[in-house]
Amino acid sequence: MNKKSIWSKTAFGSLFLLLGTAFTACSNYDFQANLTSLNQLRTSANKDINLTQDKNTLIDALKTAFENNSEGTTKVLLDAWKFSLYDAKILEKQDPVKFVKAFGSGKSKEDIEPSAGVRGLRFVERFGDNTASLIKNAILLDQQKVEVFNIRFKSSRDFTIQIKLNAKGNYKKSEVEKYKSQIGVQDNELGDKEEGTLEADLIFTYTPPASNLFSKSNFDKLTKSINFNTNLKLEMVGKDEVMRKILNSSAFTNNLASVNYPNQAVNLLPYVLYSIL
């Protein structure tokens, strides 16, 4: 083998190592060593658009941060959730460009957790598709405002997150009666008014699940998600006479006023993206 060939292989190897080192350096972010605030993420996102343009890059970076400081990183993820709902008020009005980048095309506030929609209230999970559709037509709570978002987090085994939504909407007596006839109930609880307004407070309380606690395995590039596992208690409090009648009628919604849902996963990645875009 001549000297030129040896030099070429050596030079190529050195160049490969140099490029590899440079790539590794570019892939490291300041916040990964000790993530403690949402502003650290925002600062890095302003310096490197890959964090907001490539979800897998963001997931990898946050996973490394979690491995170095699980408590601090989890608190930041939860803070991003709170910021998106409480400060940015995405249930009331979304920035359309940011929302598509964070949640994906074809998504709506039905995909926000929590919400007063069919998905947020777990109507399908509780009653099935057909009944859920009937309830949706009977009770439409389409105006939502987050009034309280409290986070108490010590570890994945010890946390409480409570979110209170005020929801307003409308009902149509004909649709309510249609639902009640489906379940064999005949009464006149709503009086003679054909339609009217509704208002309720919805209280979502998230606590640790019995198993599958939040860990680095929940940072999933395949599904592009960071799933935070919880048990959910959902309570509805009627703020007007009609809503109170509906919630107090076990025949109408099978005690919808207070329901427990185990093993509920909240994908925190869209809220992180929305809060740093």
Swiss-Prot record:
Location relative to the cell: Cell membrane
Pfam families assigned to the protein according to its UniProt record, in alphabetical order: Lipoprotein_3
Cleaved signal peptide residues: 1-25
Lipidation (S-diacylglycerol cysteine): 26
InterPro entries: Lipoprotein_3
Lipidation (N-palmitoyl cysteine): 26
Membrane topology: Lipid-anchor
Domain of life: Bacteria
GO cellular component term of the entry, any: plasma membrane
Keyword Lipoprotein included in the entry's annotation: yes
Disulphide linkage map: none
Keywords, in A-Z order: Cell membrane, Lipoprotein, Membrane, Palmitate, Signal
Principal subcellular localisation of the protein: membrane
Family to which this protein belongs: Belongs to the MG439/MG440 family.
Stated name of the protein: Uncharacterized lipoprotein MG440 homolog 1
